[in-house]
Amino acid sequence: MEQANPLRPDGESKGGVLAHLERLETQVSRSRKQSEELQSVQAQEGALGTKIHKLRRLRDELRAVVRHRRASVKACIANVEPNQTVEINEQEALEEKLENVKAILQAYHFTGLSGKLTSRGVCVCISTAFEGNLLDSYFVDLVIQKPLRIHHHSVPVFIPLEEIAAKYLQTNIQHFLFSLCEYLNAYSGRKYQADRLQSDFAALLTGPLQRNPLCNLLSFTYKLDPGGQSFPFCARLLYKDLTATLPTDVTVTCQGVEVLSTSWEEQRASHETLFCTKPLHQVFASFTRKGEKLDMSLVS
């Protein structure tokens, strides 16, 4: 008896048809996923657009209030004594500064900058974050008078608050707040990386992590194979830019070896590049995933 021909009249096997159907289903599934992601992005853009529109409207309203108050004051200037005129001008300037601070806090609340009015002026709260992780918060209590001054604050002593205030507080309060935010966010980011290294990758460290209070100078020794016979690396990370979360100067040496082989020298240089371009805990996560083999994809 002759066997049945598994091919259809057009020469296509059943297996080929099924494989084609599976490819079509995969393409449909991928297209559906891309469509859903596009809709999500469009929804987020729409929400941000609405928020921007509200903030601009708030800014225009505040400007209108300031213009109205200026007009009211100017209308009364002709009927007051010279000393009274000076007092009115000073009061007008202070009110304008207060309105400016309120507008800044309203407009930039989503960046981690918020605050509330007090009997003396305004108390500003700066919430820091790194890689989407909310970290520490700090406050600065400002007295709105002439000159503006800081009444209380919780900023660490090693943050150059007085220097920042001397530069910007009297002339540009927005620049003062944003500059302070930069310093605090960078400090929190460096501290977060050092904490993660100690808590998550202690097995790779061959000694204690040494750091100063500002966390802009770190030094440590580590081995990629804790139980192996390889020599430990010694790393020194210096952050000259106190508003940065990546080091400006990195030195990696191989402990106990005067002359390195070509492979060890390449690995040492690769480590320096990684520490300069990626957060500390991400570099050690790469070491953990790859063992002794360095994950060079992080360098690109």
UniProtKB/Swiss-Prot annotation:
Coiled coil: 18-42, 83-109
Chief location of this protein within or outside the cell: nucleus
Pfam families the UniProt entry points to: CENP-O (PF09496)
CDD domains recorded: DRWD-C_CENP-O, DRWD-N_CENP-O
Modified residues (Phosphoserine): S35
Keywords for the protein's UniProt record, in alphabetical order: Centromere, Chromosome, Coiled coil, Kinetochore, Nucleus, Phosphoprotein
Keyword Ribosomal protein carried by entry: no
Entry's Gene Ontology cellular component terms: cytosol; inner kinetochore; Mis6-Sim4 complex; nuclear body; nucleoplasm; nucleus
Single GO BP term: centromere complex assembly
Subcellular location: Nucleus; Chromosome, Centromere; Chromosome, Centromere, Kinetochore
InterPro entries assigned to the protein according to its UniProt record, in alphabetical order: CENP-O
Protein family (similarity comment): Belongs to the CENP-O/MCM21 family.
Role summary: Component of the CENPA-CAD (nucleosome distal) complex, a complex recruited to centromeres which is involved in assembly of kinetochore proteins, mitotic progression and chromosome segregation. May be involved in incorporation of newly synthesized CENPA into centromeres via its interaction with the CENPA-NAC complex. Modulates the kinetochore-bound levels of NDC80 complex.
Subunit field text: Component of the CENPA-CAD complex, composed of CENPI, CENPK, CENPL, CENPO, CENPP, CENPQ, CENPR and CENPS. The CENPA-CAD complex interacts with the CENPA-NAC complex, at least composed of CENPA, CENPC, CENPH, CENPM, CENPN, CENPT and CENPU.
Protein name: Centromere protein O
Organism: Homo sapiens (Human)
Gene (UniProt): CENPO
